[in-house]
Amino acid sequence: MKQLKIGNVLLENSYVLGPMAGVTDLPFRLLCKEQGAGLLCMEMVSAKGIFYNNKNTESLLQINPEEVPVSLQFFGSDPKIVSEMAKRVEERPFSILDINMGCPVPKVVRNGEGSALMKNPKLVYELVSATVKAIKKPVTVKIRKGFDDEHINAVEIAKIIEEAGAAAVAVHGRTREQYYSGKADWEIIRQVKEAVSIPVIGNGDVTSGEKAIAMREQTGCDGVMIARGAQGNPWIFSELLEYERTGRLPDRPDVEEIKQTMLRHARLQIEYKGDFTGIREMRKHVAWYTKGLHGAARLRDRINQVESYAELENLLTSL
């Protein structure tokens, strides 16, 4: 099993659940942990939200001791606020603090946060350096290939991040301009890997066990981050671990296992978020879990009417 060390945190394996707003909440992270993910990334949290004691931010900071090691991801652009808020939350049970420099969402970018930071190398250094000095836990950074095709600077930014004291860097092989469209450029991940000595985690288009293996072979990356490829597919982690052990990818889960996992996911949602929110948030997950299954289109038409666990259970009998 290929372990991965990030600062003083030793991961049992090098497969990482990437941070996704509205997706990598506590229930979903627990499912991915059960399937063997080596590191779980939380939904991104606003450093300003912590500063202003935003109640929605507090719910995003929930961590279950069973899911550790877990990475808490901040977004922000003020070195003072980000570093001070990192210090404020340091006693919580997360293992690693990540700084988001990849989010492409317009309102984040307009604030000079997320992927907008890639246009400001000086601020990148100040932000990472201040945060590294403020806390004892390892600090990592998630970046993109660049802001747009005219500004491909992942290698330059990764070097600055390393110089500022970060313990690892994750690289998504798309520009901000691409959002999630087109193809991820794995070549840029290889270039970053050659340019820095801290661990490099590759990200982008890893939708199956085969793709994760191909990324590692093509880029030499130390870890593989799986984000959208894990939506409705927590089994991707157990598949990869099985491949490492045996050299073959196992069969995909059958319909019954998918159904049972959806119901367990729904129970966790209700446990942590209550019936109303838990079931509503479960709807998108059901669409992902059932993609490609016989009868899935009909089920997706009806999922938005589901209001309770019993209704969900009843609906899933049609699969």
Model-assigned labels for residue ranges:
Residues 1-5, 20-95:
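Glycine-rich, positively charged N-terminal anion/phosphate-binding segment
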Residues 1-3, 11, 15, 21, ...:
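Alpha/beta catalytic cores of nucleotide-metabolism and tRNA/nucleoside-modifying enzymes
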Residues 4-16, 50-70, 103, 108-111, ...:
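N-terminal small/glycine-rich loop or linker at the start of catalytic domains
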Residues 15-19, 40-42, 70-74, 97, ...:
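Hydrophobic faces of well-ordered beta-strands that scaffold small-molecule active sites
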Residues 20, 45-47, 75-77, 102-104, ...:
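Active-site beta-loop-alpha junctions enriched in small/polar residues
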Residues 34, 83-113, 122-198:
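Alpha/beta enzyme core
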